[in-house]
């Protein structure tokens, strides 16, 4: 028997980027769910300092194809963007057996007060979890993929460049994966302190003689694995310089249209280093026979309640102040870790 729709059309609001550094609200009509769909009211959503700020600033090539299931087309303006939303299901369509009204879910969806999506898109969050922790599903999934790409071995040393949200998560997971030592490099003192609180062995400030300091801290070997997740092309050079012979540099940043100049004639060539791109849209090929996105998500949901991720939320804005939140992230990135938008319980 098909479920009865509790509501008809619902009026909502979505945040759009109309032009570089211009965020504005636009009305949305949220239709009742059709067969195989669910309708969700947003509780909180998270602003990504990496990819999302590239989009906000207009630093993504406009002909790049959007790769999120809730988005279609390309990255040109105007664009509705965002991919970390937690809300509650309030209506389900015919044939939906896995969701009921009241279920707490994570959805890769732009910043919007309510939305209707196919039932295969929402992710059930663990019972009793704080919605704030649920916001980290996307970043944690990215971090798991990066650690898989790093292929860290028991007792090896890893250095993570950048201690934003993804960098903090990568460093924590590298320890859980068996790294003997994990060092981090981060210019912001508050983030270095948070990095230490999350269990890394040493948090370094970038600058003069960084590679030399890393070699000294690793008994002259250098790092077995370096991970560049700061978004800074300069940090990629530092990662290459700090990597041990036959070591791996994992490039997990998306630089957008920022030019990247890398000297491949010195340390990279003589040390026989490997450069590896990491992007969450694909499972590492050597794992594909055994891993898929469903298994990766199971791992994320198992880790989610155990990492105390609420501590990473540094700023909380009402949804109606979203344009101000984006200006803050754009102009003062060093003052924050994770900025969230609060819609009130159930929108």
What is the predicted function of each stretch?
Residues 28-85:
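N-terminal glycine-rich beta->alpha transition that marks the start or flank
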Residues 81-108:
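A glycine-/small-residue-rich N-terminal strand-loop-strand element
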Residues 130-208, 212:
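Mid-domain Rossmann-like dinucleotide-binding core that forms the NAD(H)/NADP(H) cofactor-binding site
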Residues 198-276:
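Glycine-rich cofactor phosphate-binding loops and adjacent beta1-alpha1 units
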Residues 220, 262-313, 324:
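C-terminal substrate-binding/catalytic core of Rossmann-like NAD(P)-dependent dehydrogenases/reductases
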